[in-house]
A protein has these predicted regions:
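Divalent metal-coordination and catalytic microenvironments
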Residues: 9, 35, 50, 64-65, ...
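Residue-level marker for buried hydrophobic side chains located in beta-strands
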Residues: 6, 30-32, 61-62, 138, ...
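Short, glycine/charged-enriched secondary-structure capping and boundary segments
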Residues: 19-23, 45-48, 75-78, 153-154, ...
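Active-site neighborhood of divalent metal-dependent phosphoester bond hydrolases
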Residues: 39-129
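Short, solvent-exposed aromatic-acidic interface loops
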Residues: 231-241
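Acidic, His/Gly-enriched loop-helix segments that form or flank divalent-metal centers
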Residues: 102-216, 222, 226-228, 233
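N-terminal active-site segment of His-dependent metallophosphoesterases
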Residues: 1-49, 53-55, 59
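Short, glycine/acidic-enriched loop or turn micro-motifs at the edges of active sites
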Residues: 11-12, 38, 68, 144, ...
Length: 242
């Protein structure tokens, strides 16, 4: 069985990602669980790096709710900018346009600017899948609707936004579900900085270490018998306030 090196919720922390990828052997399948962008200081560098890994090394990058919000803003900036701003979007807009992170943003005009300046990165985000299913694992950003008769009918929106109903639901998929989205320190009721994963007896593994909130960036290697190796890179400076 192929091994998978999985990373979740980088949120613009390019330096932490570079450090974590030093542990990747180049042979295992590299999988990103979404939320490459927003809140951190260098979303553009993260997007460019991961795009290169997808194009040149066969990495797989799933969409997270922040990529979902980014595209929603681009497609309808007048209606959607405020919601995106409240979720850390200004950091990404400024990063993509080469401006200081705290530069003022025009939510409508800058949408056109982003489309023109980084069309390749926008296209990259648009083609991100929402789920990766293997013989043993389901990789997804936020989770699945486990109340459905067929979990595969989970909407794309739920795949990137769901929280408690998934966390509290019973995993009867027959597979291990690996997800991010909700920082593990919330799920574990601990302070930011814990390097523990959230593990359940029914086969759910939460691995958003809250890197941009002063936590860690997890890299987990999965194989036939579960977790083979795990890495946790500590926050390297900037801590998001929102």
């Amino acid at each position: 069985m192929r091994e998978y090196f999985v990373i979740s919720d980088v949120h613009g922390k390019a330096g932490m990602l570079d450090e974590l990828l030093q542990h990747w052997d180049g042979r295992s399948q590299l999988v990103f669980l979404g939320d490459l962008i927003d809140r951190g200081e260098d979303s553009r560098a993260v997007l460019e790096h991961v795009k290169d890994l997808v194009d040149q090394k066969g990495a797989i990058c799933l969409s997270g709710n922040h990529e979902y919000m980014f595209l929603t803003w681009l497609d309808n900036p007048e209606k959607s900018y405020d919601h995106y701003r409240r979720n850390g979007g200004d950091t990404t807009i400024n990063s993509l346009l080469g401006r200081p992170l705290n530069a003022p943003v025009d939510g409508v005009a800058d949408a056109e600017g982003v489309k023109a300046a980084v069309a390749d990165l926008v296209d990259f985000i648009r083609q991100m899948p929402f789920l990766l299913e293997t013989e043993q694992y389901i990789f997804v950003h936020a989770g699945l609707d486990l109340e459905l008769k067929d979990w595969r009918e989970t909407s794309d929106y739920q795949k990137v936004w769901i929280r408690a109903p998934f966390h509290e639901g019973s995993n009867q998929t027959g597979k291990t579900i690996v997800f991010g989205h909700t920082p593990t320190f919330y799920l574990l009721h601990e302070a930011p900085g814990t390097n523990q994963l959230w593990l359940t007896e029914d086969g759910k593994i939460g691995m958003d270490g809250g890197a941009v909130y002063g936590g860690v960036l997890h890299g987990v290697v999965f194989g036939h018998n579960g977790i083979i190796e795990r890495y946790a890179i500590k926050n390297d400076g900037l801590v998001a306030e929102d």
